[in-house]
């Protein structure tokens, strides 16, 4: 799923109010980190992460590696923080994020 610029802007706005829940340290991305990211994405759809200063990777590198492993999209990377999005497949989730549709694509 490729996000449009309008959808990215919408998700960036939503990400402003959420707390950082993933913290990547010097150990990098391990199985526990991957499980935590997958669980959080399924429950919340939009998650914010942070890379500590002692980490061996940059926030861009972490986001670019986590996205394909979690089947998510990188929404934003600023400094040591990153935001990932993946639509939830849970049927019991009441407050799903509804992305704006691009008018040009919808007309096709």
Predicted regions and their residues:
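Positively charged, polar, low-complexity stretches
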Residues: 1-108
């Amino acid at each position: 799923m490729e996000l449009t610029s309008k959808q990215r802007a919408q998700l960036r706005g939503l990400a402003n109010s959420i707390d950082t829940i993933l913290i990547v340290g010097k150990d990098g991305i391990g199985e526990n980190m991957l499980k935590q990211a997958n669980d959080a994405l399924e429950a919340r759809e939009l998650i914010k992460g942070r890379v500590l200063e002692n980490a061996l990777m940059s926030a861009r590198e972490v986001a670019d590696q986590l996205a394909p492993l979690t089947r998510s999209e990188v929404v934003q990377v600023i400094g040591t923080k990153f935001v990932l999005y993946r639509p939830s497949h849970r049927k019991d989730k009441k407050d799903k994020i509804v992305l704006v549709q691009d008018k040009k694509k919808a007309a096709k």
